[in-house]
Amino acid sequence: MRQFGALRGGRRGLLGCPAGDRGLGGVPRRPLPKGSTSPTLSIYTKNHFFYIMSFMKELELKYGCNPNQKPARVFMENGDLPITVVNGRPGYINLLDALNGWQLVKELKEATGLPAATSFKHVSPAGAAVGLPLSDTLKKIYFTDNVELTPLACAYARARGADRMSSFGDFISLSDECDEATALLIKKEVSDGVIAPGYSEKALEILKAKKNGNYCVIQIDPNYVPAELERKQVFGVTFEQGHNFLKIDEKSAFSNIVTKNKTLSEDDKRNLIISLIVLKYTQSNSVCFVKDGQAIGIGAGQQSRVHCTRLAGQKADNWWLRQSPQVLGLQFVDGIKRADRDNAIDVYIGEEYMDVLAEGKWKNIFKVKPEVFTREAKAEWIAKNTNVALGSDAFFPFGDNIDRAKKSGVTVIAQPGGSVRDDLVIEAADGYGMVMAFNGIRLFHH
């Protein structure tokens, strides 16, 4: 049988009995997840929740991308699905997020040796991170003050906290067994669901109580490997391609450094690898800023490369501004919800700050009316950010991307190269003393 967090001996053939039969030790089988084609079995022990994954060849869905797109299902042409729905009922987009997010965190864990988490929305990550300890400032802006944090919980707090506006209502992917500390963080956030290779007994109890018992919890077989060929249909036309098994590591990511400055610290290397793995599962065009083991700005799905860089840079700036004394000192009214506080901060540090500072409005949000966070003060604070890594899923065609990256503290870059203006892009990077690698790896994802 299969234990959450580990593989155990036994046979899934035990599930051939009728759904009404009693399982091992006389424990009744759980009701079938809706859409499942076979029964499942759950057993509790002192520390873990045991769950036998069902022979699930397909899963019926309520609808596809939109309510009018019926019928809908996910299925395997050959073999069983590598997932089991433990609780709730995932939707079409939930599963797209879950399966893309799982690949991302699995590869982050393999590349760094650290637990990893990602927060997905509409088939792109809003945040992704590995489990490095949090500073006191990060604990405050991630709402984890005075909370016990495991490495996996740190990874999730970072992934969720980088772009809280975009992560609202996300689908979470975890590289490791979900522990109680991580589940307690998830419990407090607005989220659609989570996928992980396992769950501790306490974590599962916490998650199953979320959303009035409807929170989506998915277990994935960590040893599942997809077929070498993958297919999808568009307008009735079938597309086929080889699965992207490209491994991103130190050798592939930045062995060809083209700038005068060629010095990369171990932190730089890890951050660049993280940025590229994130891009591998982000809708193109995409650019990713990473600092201290977490994505701090992801620009996804833009037709223009420089707009990717601007979008990711703005998100990185907002993440950094949230750590400024002026924002940390904001005094919110008692009982304000997290989402309202996140929105107020986002508006306050932006150009439309009067929307929260105007008379008749600020008293609904703040105990004390804040001073305007001026452009000059924001620029001064942003200039203090440094040691940021930048990855791009395709080449930079112009040096303006480098100029914009510099404004958000970028010091190291990994990109494919291959532009007819590579010499000008290198010249721009050299002008700032940056390290830039041409890795020849395009990471388009659609």
Model features per residue range: what roles?
Residues T45-E250, D268-S286:
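Active-site loops and adjacent core secondary-structure elements that bind or stabilize anionic groups
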Residues E77-R89, A162-F168, G242-K262, D340-W362, ...:
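Gly-rich Lys/Arg/Thr-decorated short loops/hinges at beta-loop-alpha junctions or inter-strand turns
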Residues A111-S119, V217-I220, S284-K291, L321-F332, ...:
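Flexible, glycine/charged-enriched surface loops at secondary-structure junctions
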Residues A126-R164, I296-F395:
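Glycine- and Gly-Pro-enriched alpha-helical subdomains that act as flexible
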Residues L174-S175, K188-V217, Y224, N385-L390, ...:
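C-terminal binding/interaction regions
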Residues I218-L264, S324-I336, D342, V368-K369:
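Long, charged amphipathic helices and adjacent flexible linkers at domain junctions
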